[in-house]
Structures are given as C-alpha cells and as structure tokens.
UniProtKB/Swiss-Prot annotation:
GO terms for cellular component: mitochondrial inner membrane; respiratory chain complex IV. Cu cation A2 binds at residues 196, 198, 200, 204. Binds a dinuclear copper A center per subunit. This is Cytochrome c oxidase subunit 2. It is a multi-pass membrane protein. Its EC number is 7.1.1.9. One of its GO terms (molecular function) is copper ion binding.
C-alpha cells in the first residue's frame, strides 16, 4: 500500500514484483555510476586549464568508450529479458478470472465456477468505513488464494482500460474485442490496491481495483458463500 511521502515502490507481494524491484535497483546503480563519472569529467574539465596532449587523439580511449557502453547495455538487457519472459510465463494456473473493464467499474467472472461473478464499484467517500481508503475501496473485492498461480483474462466492454495492481507487478491493457492474459502468484496474504491505468473518460479516476489474497481454505469458504448467494 502506498503512503504519503513515499519515495520507493510498494512492498512486493509476488515473485515477479520482487524481480522487478531487484532489476530497478540494478539499473539505478548503473545510472548512478555513469552519472558520477560524467559529473567528474565535467568538473575536471571546468576546473583546470591544462590539456593532456596524449588524450587528444587516443585510440585507446576510442576503444574504451565504444566497448564500455556495449557491455553496460548487455548488463541491462540480460536481466530485463529474463523478467520479460517470466511475466509472460503462465504454467498450469490453479484459478482463472476474467476481468472486464466498463465505464467506470470492473466486473469479474471466475471461469472455473459455473456461476461465480460480480461487478466491482468504487465505494463513495461518504460511505467509507473508518480505516478505509478514499478512491481505492470497492464494494466487492477480487478474492484469490495465496501461493497459487492465478491467470487473469483482461478485456473491455466499451473503451480502452488497463488492469493494474502495483504490489503484484501486474499491468495489462483491456482492449474491446481483444482478450489479453497475464498471471501472478500472491506470495503473502493481504489486500492489494490498484486502479485503471488507461485514461478512459470522465470517471477514469474512480475505477479502483482491490485484490484480497487469502489462504486456500478461506478462499474455498468464500467461493461457497458466493455460490450460495448467486
């Protein structure tokens, strides 16, 4: 969950998000080292009037500043490609949920069950209970079992939307007439908040997403109650 004055990412709640955080730190360190080197060179050039005649036409320097950027790009590209393939990998999902974007709410359908689905609307500010978050709470949460692969099928009924939950490392575009898919594994129990991440009209800011990860037995009890009420 994000909080005021936060400078970093939200706490990771899935293996993919943990990998993304590690890659961010890895890339940021490379950027920091390059920036430090460039700043040192600029300060050295400005602070002295002396000129080294041996570097005016140095083949060694030409070789270094050609090879070094190539090595840096490889060091960034390899972990990036690894995470890219991890995000696209969907192996034997235990649960499949279809998320449909509407103006301006989400609807969810648990395709492994015969009649388990619901619409999820934002809770108005005046109806919030103590401790709930403004513009982030919904009347129905998307409940998933923790430590289980969950596949999300994402589409839209009207215009472009985007289903995104930062703590889970998930962001998938919802395109009318197209079915996109992604997957995640919630590594710990908790309530994780997200929002529509594609401008979709006047009430774009009022399309929150709430994912609640619970132990498997709690999920089975919840699904049984939902099926009884259907």
């Amino acid at each position: 969950m994000a909080h005021p004055t936060q400078l970093g990412f939200q706490d990771a709640a899935s293996p993919v998000m943990e990998e993304l955080l590690h890659f961010h730190d890895h890339a940021l360190m490379i950027v920091f080292l390059i920036s430090t080197l460039v700043l040192y060179i600029i300060i050295a050039m400005v602070s002295t009037k002396l000129t080294n005649k041996y570097i005016l036409d140095s083949q060694e320097i030409e070789i270094v500043w050609t090879i070094l950027p190539a090595v840096i790009l490889v060091l960034i590209a390899l972990p990036s490609l690894r995470i890219l393939y991890l995000m696209d990998e969907i192996n034997d999902p235990h649960l499949t949920i279809k998320a449909m974007g509407h103006q301006w709410y989400w609807s969810y359908e648990y395709t492994d069950y015969e009649n388990l689905g619901f619409d999820s609307y934002m809770v108005p500010t005046q109806d919030l209970a103590p401790g709930q978050f403004r513009l982030l709470e919904t009347d129905h949460r998307m409940v998933v079992p923790m430590e289980s692969p969950v596949r999300i099928l994402v589409s839209a009924e009207d215009v472009l939307h985007s289903w995104a939950v930062p703590s889970l490392g998930v962001k998938m575009d919802a395109v009318p007439g197209r079915l996109n898919q992604t997957a995640f594994i919630a590594s710990r129990p908790g309530v994780f908040y997200g929002q529509c991440s594609e401008i979709c009209g006047a009430n774009h800011s009022f399309m929150p997403i709430v994912v609640e990860a619970v132990p498997l037995e709690h999920f089975e009890n919840w699904s049984s109650l939902m099926l009884e009420d259907a």
